[in-house]
Amino acid sequence: GAGEGEIARFVASWLQRMGVEVVWDEPVPGRPSVVGIVRGSGGGRSLLLNAHMDTVGVTGMQRPHEPLIEGTRLYGRGAYDMKAGLAAIMLAAAEAKKMTLRGDVILTAVADEEYASIGTQSIIKRWRADAAIVTEPTALQLCVAHKGFLWFEIVTRGTAAHGSRPDLGRDAIVKMGHVLLGLERLNQELQARPPHYLLGHGSLHASLIQGGQELSSYPERCTLQVERRTIPGETPEQVEAEVRDLLEQLHAADATFEATVRTTLQRAPFEVVPDAEIVQTVRRHATLDDAPEIVGNAAWMDAALLTAAGIPTVVFGPGGAGAHAVVEWSDLQQLKKCSAVLVNTLREFCA
């Protein structure tokens, strides 16, 4: 798309007006992230606040970039995923500027979470913190785990020939049919394994398939894109081995079966223990009548990258609905509550 330049400039300008130190981080041209720093007096713990600025497409939406408020709901593309969470950390950073803290507050408004996460990946190379809060939408619940994923490309090989010459042709699409049946069996095996206590089971599905050139020819190539969703404890090596084993079994049963597999993208799952200090600190300040629930999320978030970098992380953000949907909205009351919880959390954690 157009990149994050315009929204990044807005975030940077707003933070500067609030007196927050701003660093511009642009590892890829046109995909900037903004870091806002409220420096403490020294000797305290630092807290990183993370939200992404990018959104998905707007096909089918009516006036997606014109904000509409009805009651406590703000409608528009990105309102839920995740401009509300971004607004919450901006407000919290502005409040932090008014406090006397020993530790630093580091706001990271990042690019590209929806695809390759180049924003957060660049941030963790340059910045460290004692804990982090990602304000993806959780309806003010505490998310301590989410799934990871791997994307595979499987290619089966055939022999091109005229459709009238079955003695010469070998059908790559038919060969891929055996792969699809094998993947279905593998997915059934995944459902029979012990589930994660918050996330359930891992899963896989065939996402895209392409093969053949014309009706009167045997296809020499068929390509399948597969997504495998992983749970904590499942490693990329284990997942890749399962797919390779399937292809080897198919070759053992049919010497004419030829296939290759490669991983095109992988992201680890995320998990933090519920009694981690950052989780419990947020929980204390988020407790009104009842303590917020400890939950998991099936989607992937940048929390996994922060945790892998050694930063204990929890996901806590305002509610709403419609991520990646035609109708998207965020709850403005929950946005205010989220920001207040962040302010009280950083006041304690960075004291």
Name these PLM-found stretches.
Residues 45-48, 72-73, 105-106, 130-133, ...:
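Structural motif
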Residues 82-151, 350-351:
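Acidic/histidine-rich catalytic neighborhood of metal-dependent amide-processing enzymes
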Residues 50-51, 108-110, 133-136, 155-157, ...:
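Short beta-strand segments
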Residues 2, 23-28, 153-351:
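Metal-dependent amide/peptide-bond hydrolase catalytic core
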Residues 1-77, 98-101, 284:
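Acidic/His- and Gly-rich active-site-bordering loop/insert found
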Residues 54-70, 144-155, 281, 314:
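Acidic-glycine-rich active-site phosphate/pyrophosphate-binding loop
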Residues 72-88, 162:
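Glycine/serine-rich anion-binding loops at beta->alpha junctions
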